[in-house]
Amino acid sequence: MALAVCACGTAASPPGHGDARTVSRVGSATHDPTTPAERAAAVTARSTFRDDIGNASSAFVADVAHLQGDLQAGDVAAARSDELAAQAQFDQFRQLAGGDPINASTVDELATQVGPGQSFGGLHAVERDLWSVPGGDVGAALSDASGLEAQAPVAEFLLSKDAPAPEAIGVLGVDDLNWLVDQAVTEDQERYSHLDAVDIAATADAADTAVSAIAPLDHLVDPTLAAEVAEGCTALLADVAALGPPTQVTDGQLGAPQLLALSRQADAAAADLARLSADLVPFGTGGDGDP
């Protein structure tokens, strides 16, 4: 599985100081009226992010299909790799998928989140099947992966209907960073494989995807704050890369000082991104519909 770690928010360079404007960063933006260049950049941001999510959801469907095929062949090692790849792809659109809680829980629910009378399924059920016993429980994994294979195209279809506005894209990035700190860094997700570095790396990359999509618009609206967001995100990705290969570094190998530094960097990046997202309110809020 390849987890891309790319330069965050470097899609455009800040314009000259002569183009600077006064922008409110408290609650909502007062940047009005918008310019034709900004409106064009807003349309591009929505289209770019929609394509990014579409690519991730398509890859998720493919990874789940590979998982089913490798389980049918009895190849546990390959199936484990497929499960981690699918988990990383889900992390790319986790926050957007959260708009449909039933679909999201069907795909990525933890055992402790299963309600009375409900059955445990999805990615973490397959993870349990593959890692909780030596050599994996292929029969159980096949059953759980079959349900996941049926649900994956549903998730892809639901996501295809979303085209978040620039402000909403920024908020999704903030949510990614908050989830990274509150859920991934705490090592609460991968309870059987103990490879939470997969979630850490993929979620940081998801935040980067959001920041990169709105970067050209950000640099037109508030170049100074846009540069701060880019710098913070680049520093976060460097911290994540320093942890090592996500699929090879177990939770026991992740040092507390490293995780604390990463959490602080993610918190700082989230704060800056939240401020910048508020400046994008004039370009629309919310999500459904064509860009």
Residue map of PLM features:
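Mature extracytoplasmic or organellar-lumen-exposed domains after removal of signal/transit peptides
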Residues: 9-291
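C-terminal motif of bacterial Sec signal peptides marking the signal peptidase cleavage site
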Residues: 4-7
